[in-house]
Amino acid sequence: MEKHIFCNLDLLRLNLPVPNIKTICRSFVNYMKEINKDTDTYIYFVSRNRNDLNDAKEAYTDRGYHGFNFIHRITAGDAVRRRNHQNQQFIFISGKDVDFHLAVNSQSLFIVPDWIPNESSARKYGVVVDTPLQLFKFIKTLYNQQSWFAKSIIEPGVTALSLMDARYRSKTYTDNERDMIINFENLLKRGRSRNYYDILMYHFLAGMTNTTLFDNIELFGMIPSSDCSLNPDLFSFMHQVRVIKNRHIPRNIPHGENILLRMVPKLKAHESYRADERANMGAIDEFRTLCVNPDFKNKIDTLRRENRLNLCIFDDYMTHGNTFNAVRNLFKALGANKMVFVSLGSFKQPFRKKDYTINGSVYNIGYTYSLNQSSVKYFDYDDNAKYEVDELYDIFNQDD
């Protein structure tokens, strides 16, 4: 796939107050030269200072780096806006907020090198890399990331995805994957190593870069926990994707910024029901406690009138799809055009599709529902996704 990589000129500065900056800069330049050998890759160094651009161009051309382009930030912005429908082709590497906003406006991937000056939004929402080697390896994964661990077209306009296998006890393929999934359950991995949410975020962003599936998503949300709270790590994951995709929430949100609310706690299904009961219970447990946030009603009504009511909903796990079933039916009742359900982990069970007729307002609990029909949808599994996650684990948890 053709890629256009826009690098802030800070990446070539040798006077940054960073230990071994000359070695770091030389390593970065050589890795970018290696990436540039791909005939479908174009590398641009960007600045608003034309004199700095001319000096850098002269210096690096004299050293034999003929594949690099040096362009003004206005020129870069114009080029991106002209090809805004081709956002999968763009990668931005910078620590500047101005570059971050250009990436967001074009819904492009934004990578933040830790060794150059970082501004607040860039560092908060970008993919942070610690070394030139991490940067090089991560960019290479963008060329190869083609796999979701599990995918199923539930019905026209509704897709369910899972990023990784959640069955670590007997089914994982590598030690790294086992480590990832154990931490996926206990949330204990912190400190210097990348949190597993970060690894899955990078995996998701790499996949999102290579598909148009998410381009027209207007609303992002997540499944509330059984106790009505929002898992802070999953919320951060969802929020980061929403910001990167340049999607906004309503201004007045007394009920919070998640599109789904759990109004009363519910029993955890795996602690309260037998396996066969969970497989066949459908959305009933969810309907009793789950509703759409009324703060989003005006926005939802507007999107529906414009045929743009397209949503992406995140959850930690998918077993039988009971929660996603509930959400699918709630938003079908509101006239949704497109829904993408993304679970971070899958237990490799079929999706138990159940279609309901819903009466009453779905903006509070108390609506009524009746089952119309049931069917089973199977997932396509791709074990290549296991190795892609495994590779990212290695990239971001190694000593360079």
Task: Please name every model-derived segment.
Residues 91-129:
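Acidic, Mg2+-coordinating phosphoryl-transfer loop and its flanking beta/alpha structural elements
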Residues 77-98, 310-313:
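Conserved Lys-Pro-Asp/Glu-containing loop-to-beta segment of HAD-superfamily phosphomonoesterases
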Residues 132-172, 325-400:
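PRPP-dependent phosphoribosyltransferase catalytic core
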Residues 141-219, 227, 267-304:
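Active-site-facing substrate-recognition patch
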Residues 20-60, 70-73:
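Substrate-recognition element of Asp-dependent hydrolases with the DxDx(T/V) motif
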Residues 15, 272-369:
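PRPP/pyrophosphate-binding module of the type I phosphoribosyltransferase fold
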Residues 2-22, 313-315:
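Asp-based phosphoryl-transfer active-site loop
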Residues 44-46, 91, 215-226:
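Short glycine-rich phosphate-binding loop at a beta-alpha junction
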